[in-house]
A protein has these predicted regions:
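An N-terminal assembly and electron-transfer interface module characteristic of large anaerobic redox
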Residues: 1-588
Length: 588
């Protein structure tokens, strides 16, 4: 039977792993006995292939060095409390544990790691390993390998390393373990401190401080990123990490470097959604940057919307029953203002009218949020409908939908403000919505439970009841918004999910998950056939759920025209503009 075969396979796998562990331990015992140099060669599972790793392990052993792998720590309980890293990938956890194991051994045991260019979590994993080894006065040797056939430089590095290690063994000095630096926890006494948070979007970011005030905290949103943010971010985060992380780290470091905030009386907040995306480790990157700059008295708050996020903050307490209704209303309100603004700005009778109304209504929302009056926000939307109608000319405009990674598609600086570029050419931008990002959770919960990926700890009727409460508010917004002449209503998230199912499995929930497919399908079904997808360069998750679905989505919607743009801190303005010009030529 299948069950018997699975059980047999698992037992065989377990026996194989035990054999690997035993063989590695045997090599270590022999090396220890002879006090010979031992190198722990760590890497991805595929680096065990001699072809992929260019026989580096053979090369090292031919020099009289004992070579072991990270399998030495399999099934060992090695705590990683001092590491700023979200332990959610099995192989990265093993690599970290092997680095700590090697660090704790004598000087004759050294650590070497193989990495392939652009390999996901390595962007922050390598920094953590380097810091970990440094605490034990050991160095990280990192070999970047790819498919090149010329391995001369690698051989030279390996030979040089082995020779230098042999020399250092003869001059071995007593090592002193350094105590790892860490940031304090957010405790009850920190509740009165000012909290700063990175800028996200021109629509919801201005309202976040008011929402936090309702929760009992004083928060300020940092200014939108600039070139200075890029410079600080590149200096204090790994240059191969995704672009949003560079900007977020840079914004926070810049705020303290410019003296706008006292690090001893300030806390940093960052939202986290969990999941396989590298964004789950943003909090670790921020902690590392603060420690490197000496801001060791600044606690970090994780505002988590997903599971698997572990950040101890015993003093952070929120009455969510009090805050969630006004927070939901604020998100819907800001999304609705975004719909009004983007439809009106290409039709405004006088330049600047739409921007003026947008700013006015976002500012008007702040006192209503402070008073915790969600219904009053709806009343203001009714007023906004009339005013946005008055500034619009009656004309038809070509439309472009914007999708992509959440930070890129919402943040003007990160995307080089391409929405304004399109508006200046008379193209109506159909904006991304925060509402959909949160509403997809209802679909994901049901899909995960029905697929037996997660246990059914929430009954369907409870999910449906909560969804109904939220959908009721969305229906109210749609009812008010339809009075605006160019309003496109909020779509039912389950209907969007059904469209996405034609393209991709709803179990695909990493990165933006199935939402990109759903948004593209929704645009195409509404006759919006031109879509721009914005991604950070090297964003593995979104490359799969966006670029990976293009062929399929074009087979379902042959008329759709997709432009994928990748961004990082060094992307060429000219390259982006040229691609946009070619894209626009197909619209008009």
């Amino acid at each position: 039977t299948t069950l018997f075969r699975s059980d047999h396979a698992l037992k065989a796998q377990d026996a194989f792993e035990k054999e690997l562990i035993a063989y590695n331990r045997q090599i270590v015992e022999e090396g220890n006995k002879k006090q010979k140099l031992i190198i722990l060669l760590a890497g991805r599972p595929y680096h065990s292939d001699p072809l992929v790793q260019h026989k580096i392990s053979n090369m090292i052993s031919a020099m009289g060095v004992y070579v072991i792998t990270d399998d030495i720590v399999r099934h060992q309980d090695i705590p990683l409390k001092e590491v700023n890293f979200l332990a959610q990938w099995a192989f990265t956890n093993r690599i970290l544990k092997s680095a700590k194991w090697a660090a704790q051994q004598g000087n004759h045991v050294q650590y070497m790691q193989l990495t392939s260019f652009g390999c996901g979590p390595d962007a922050f994993l390598i920094d953590e390993i380097r810091t970990l080894l440094k605490q034990y006065n050991k160095n990280l040797t990192l070999l970047k390998i790819d498919d090149v056939s010329n391995t001369g430089s690698i051989k030279l590095r390996v030979r040089s390393l082995v020779e230098s290690l042999h020399i250092s063994l003869q001059q071995a000095e007593e090592r002193q373990v350094q105590k790892p630096l860490s940031l304090p926890l957010f405790t009850k006494k920190d509740r009165k401190k000012k909290i700063i948070a990175p800028f996200f979007t021109p629509f919801i970011s201005p309202l976040i401080p008011s929402i936090f005030k309702v929760a009992g905290y004083e928060m300020e949103t940092l200014p939108i990123s600039d070139e200075c943010s890029c410079d600080w971010g590149l200096k204090y985060s790994n240059n191969e990490v995704c672009y949003p992380a560079t900007l977020i780290v840079g914004d926070i470091v810049k705020a303290f470097k410019e003296g706008r905030y006292d690090p001893d009386n300030t806390c940093v907040a960052i939202t986290q959604t969990g999941g396989q995306c590298r964004a789950s480790n943003y909090i670790s990157l921020i902690k590392k940057a603060l420690i490197e700059n000496g801001y060791t008295h600044t606690p970090i708050l994780s505002i988590a919307f997903g599971s698997g996020i572990d950040n101890q903050q015993p003093g952070f307490k929120v009455n969510w029953l009090k805050v969630l209704p006004i927070a939901l209303a604020a998100v819907l309100y800001s999304d609705c203002i975004a719909k009004f603004y983007y439809a009106a700005v290409v039709r405004e009778k006088k330049p600047g009218q739409a921007a003026k109304l947008k700013d006015m209504y976002l500012e008007a929302a702040k006192p209503l949020i402070l008073k915790n009056r969600p219904e009053d926000l709806l009343s203001y939307l009714s007023l906004a409908v009339d005013e946005f109608n008055q500034i619009c000319q009656q004309k038809s405009c070509p439309k472009v939908g914007v999708v992509g990674e959440i930070f890129l598609k919402f943040n003007p600086f990160a995307q080089k403000d391409i929405t304004t570029w399109l508006i200046d050419r008379g193209i109506e931008v159909i904006p991304p919505l925060m509402t959909d990002f949160f509403m997809q959770s209802f679909v994901n919960m049901k899909v995960n439970q029905d697929s037996h990926i997660k246990k059914k700890y929430i009954p369907d009727f409870a999910i449906d009841w909560l969804y109904g409460k939220v959908q009721k508010q969305i229906d109210k917004i749609n009812k008010i918004g339809k009075a605006f002449l160019h309003f496109q209503p909020f779509e039912n998230i389950y209907e969007k999910a059904e469209k996405a199912k034609q393209v991709i499995s709803l179990n695909t929930q990493f990165g933006e998950g199935w939402l990109i497919a759903g948004e593209m399908s929704s645009f195409a079904s509404q006759g919006i056939n031109h879509v721009i997808s914005l991604q950070p360069f090297g964003c593995i998750a979104n490359h799969i759920v966006e670029k990976g679905i293009e062929k399929r989505i074009k087979s379902v919607y042959p008329q759709i025209n997709i432009l994928s743009l990748d961004f990082d801190s060094s992307v060429s303005d000219v390259n982006i503009t040229n691609r946009l010009l070619l894209f626009v030529d197909n619209i008009k």
